[in-house]
Swiss-Prot record:
Species per Swiss-Prot/TrEMBL record: Xenopus laevis (African clawed frog)
GO cellular component: nucleus; transcription regulator complex
Cystine connections: none
Compartments where found: Nucleus
Organs and tissues of expression: Expressed in adult brain, lung, spleen and kidney. Isoform b is generally expressed at a higher level than isoform a.
GO molecular-function terms, A-Z: LIM domain binding; transcription coregulator activity
Gene Ontology process terms (BP): negative regulation of transcription by RNA polymerase II; nervous system development; positive regulation of transcription by RNA polymerase II
Name of the protein: LIM domain-binding protein 2
Region annotation Disordered: where it falls in the sequence: 245-280, 354-398
Keyword Lipid metabolism: no
InterPro entries with a match to the protein in the record: LID (IPR041363), LIM-bd/SEUSS (IPR029005)
Amino acid sequence: MSSTPHDPFYSSPFGPFYRRHAPYMVQPEYRIYEMNKRLQTRTEDSDNLWWDAFATEFFEDDATLTLSFCLEDGPKRYTIGRTLIPRYFSTVFEGGVTDLYYILKHSKESYHNSSITVDCDQCTMVTQHGKPMFTKVCTEGRLILEFTFDDLMRIKTWHFTIRQYRELLPRSILAMHAQDPQVLEQLSKNITRMGLTNFTLNYLRLCVILEPMQELMSRHKTYNLSPRDCLKTCLFQKWQRMVAPPAEPTRQTTTKRRKRKNSTNNASNSNAGNNATSAYNRKKVPAASLNLSNQVPFPTTKKCIGDKTRVRRNYRGIRNGLDVMVVGEPTLMGGEFGDEDERLITRLENTQYDAANGMDDEEDFNSSPALGNNSPWNSKPPPNAETKSDNPTQQASQ
């Protein structure tokens, strides 16, 4: 029995160590883990360029960061933009924090067309303080993150709602200063407010003023204007936006389409024709009383036989009030024709019906599929009906 060479890179799926062959998409929660690792690589010499690079890596250009918590004087809510986010993280470490990381438990992810939302109701922001005494602060709350659905997967919105916080001290420190009441009193005081240092809180209060001034600062850097001129320009543009009427939505130009006549018109025309025919059968009046040309327009052609001229109707169904379709030019490349592209079809007004000249068309007319079985045109005229004149033009002149 020949033995096959053993593959050192082969891993059985049923073995204790299963190797994943295809890499999966990076989970949004893993981005928080990467952000924690990046914060751990921070040094004391990290300048503004390092913090700008940090914010560019994990936050979108139009990202916003919101903090909500409740202080002694009431609830607070601070929202800062992308330009102020790097400074926010730097103030955390400038306030005496030596380490910062976030822990997410039981987070829920929801995928949308262009974003991924992570909702974690049990988020803990852990900060370690070295001054005045080693203290570990655990700030608990709800963190809602919105990531972009792309390869970078950067944060668009960051909303952290703080519920409670705890400040933890090592037992060894308490045992060392157990006999010193002044030190114990100092250790019993909180070093943070809702898990945030006074340095960070002061910066958030300053952001209330700085955030509306971002437009002035960017205009000053772009156009090199004085602060007073920047303020005048911004106020004038804001006034223009308030005074300007709302823009109307653009309407798409639609080409004209040919429409068939309404069914109500067809029904009225049919009723008019039936009423005229019943009156003809009842009173035995000439067929000239039924003027079809005034009810339904139709195209006609002339046919000359000797010195007599008669009219032959091209569409048999129009005598019963049916629709008349207009012949259009062939459509090229999906184009549509409007009113100016239609053929000009002329017609001849015929005020009376010539029964003598229509004898040769009677058979074809009665067998037309456009007529129904109960149509009055299929019934034979009464034997004692009056004979019409051969020349319709003479009767029209009378």
